[in-house]
Amino acid sequence: MSHQMAPWIPMFIQSCKNNTEPFVSFQFATVDELTNKPRCRTVVFRDFLFHDKRTNVLTFNTDMRSSKITESFITPNSNNSSDSKRCETPFFEACFYFPETWEQYRFSGQCFTISKQFKKIPAEIVTKYDIFSPRFSETNDDSTDEEIDTPINDDDDDDKNNDADNNDINEDNKLIESIENDEHHEDEDDYYPQPQEWEAELLRQWSSLSRHTKSLYRKPAPGQKLTSETSKQLDKLHRGVDGAKEDAGLENFGIVCLCVDSVDFLNLKEGRGGERWIFQKTDGKDEDLWEEQEVCP
């Protein structure tokens, strides 16, 4: 079993650290499964999967009712029930640009989602990208702490007084603790994340959101027609009097995970008119390997 950090990760982390904006935003593009038309939107980088840069998996948060999910992550005319609904793994391209350092990263690969709605993570993408259980990564001292300040921890002061609402997910927190203390893993399949570990990651990222951000997942579905009723709902949310508990939006919350196959890095501030590197993932016998090639910018 190998769990190694890709060679482009340190460069990317440093670029994020050099960013002075409150968020690291980027463009995320997929192809609509039904129309075969390209779709692109701006999203916010949240963290590495399981808060471990060695997964080489980037994440951002999304509303599972949004068009990006129906366009790319759900098979057209699927009749799967909610309990057995399968997450698709579409190809993607993502582009980060850091204007202060004139650096650009273009990522391509496959992606999947973690949510209450998608109970099953496709095993083929987990094994293809060697996404190992966080139980193994937690034994290593390497982490993203103090290396990259992503907006995953965007709590506001009001959240500190949320004891009543937080009691609603105490059982979920116990789940996370039980996973961290679990040392039983004998089968090869145990190297990969178990269902409760995917759920724990969902709760970790959800719990790190501010009260305001959580409220966005209680809004009417994105793209829904604006009526007098939906206007009232939005107004109540804006004033904080909608009457719903803070975690009511968890059902609509999802994490999109970007599994990277290739990286095109361009640095226009570097001498000699800039520099450009291509990183390409290759499948080794026992571990994933990366080929690096400097090319003309």
From Swiss-Prot:
Gene3D superfamilies: Electron Transport, Fmn-binding Protein, Chain A (2.30.110.10). Residues 136-174 are annotated as: Disordered. InterPro entries: Pyridox_Oxase_Alr4036_FMN-bd (IPR024624), Split_barrel_FMN-bd (IPR012349). Residues 139-170 have a biased composition (Acidic residues). GO terms for molecular function: FMN binding; pyridoxamine phosphate oxidase activity. GO terms for cellular component: cytoplasm; nucleus. SUPFAM superfamilies: FMN-binding split barrel. It comes from the Eukaryota. Pfam families: Pyridox_oxase_2 (PF12766). To S.pombe SpBC725.03. Present with 2840 molecules/cell in log phase SD medium. This is Uncharacterized protein YGR017W. It comes from Saccharomyces cerevisiae (strain ATCC 204508 / S288c) (Baker's yeast). The lineage of its organism: Eukaryota, Fungi, Dikarya, Ascomycota, Saccharomycotina.
